[in-house]
């Protein structure tokens, strides 16, 4: 990883630490309301009008730097694999694989072995048995 990417990963880590947990308005009052973020749209809504004690709004400034957005913390781009044939399409210099959950233990072991031969990083190898 080049020094600029490493710096941007550190910036992303700091920004994620400062980011508040965005919660839906009044989700603490009603059991039927999930905590999942929904933009407040009420005309008199305190959260929409940015009252300090009512929780933060999701805004552009909380985002990660564009160069490292969506990357795995290891610095690799995440690629979902569900067959051995898909391994040939992966570039090991900047991509790492994640084996699909529907894959059984035997096929997963084969994919991991082929990935090691090709020098590809596996993000979810599981327990070795």
Swiss-Prot record:
Record-linked InterPro entries: Ribosomal_eL32 (IPR001515), Ribosomal_eL32_arc (IPR023654), Ribosomal_eL32_CS (IPR018263), Ribosomal_eL32_sf (IPR036351)
Keyword Ribosomal protein applies: yes
Gene Ontology terms, MF aspect: structural constituent of ribosome
Gene Ontology CC annotation, any one: cytosolic large ribosomal subunit
Record bears the keyword Ribonucleoprotein: yes
Pfam family, one: Ribosomal_L32e
CDD domains: Ribosomal_L32_L32e (cd00513)
SUPFAM superfamilies assigned: Ribosomal protein L32e
Alphabetical UniProt keywords: Ribonucleoprotein, Ribosomal protein
Record HAMAP family: Ribosomal_eL32
Stated name of the protein: Large ribosomal subunit protein eL32
Organism: Methanosarcina mazei (strain ATCC BAA-159 / DSM 3647 / Goe1 / Go1 / JCM 11833 / OCM 88)
């Amino acid at each position: 990883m080049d020094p600029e990417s490493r710096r941007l990963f550190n910036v992303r880590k700091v920004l994620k630490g400062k980011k508040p947990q965005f919660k839906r308005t009044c989700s603490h009052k009603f059991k039927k309301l999930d905590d999942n973020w929904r933009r407040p749209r009420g005309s008199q809504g305190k959260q929409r009008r940015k009252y300090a004690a009512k929780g933060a709004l999701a805004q552009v400034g909380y985002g990660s730097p564009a160069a490292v957005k969506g990357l795995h913390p290891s610095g690799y781009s995440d690629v979902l694999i569900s067959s051995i044939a898909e391994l040939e399409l992966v570039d090991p210099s900047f991509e790492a694989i994640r084996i699909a959950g529907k894959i059984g233990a035997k096929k997963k072991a084969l994919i991991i072995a082929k990935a090691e031969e090709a020098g590809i990083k596996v993000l979810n190898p599981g327990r070795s048995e």
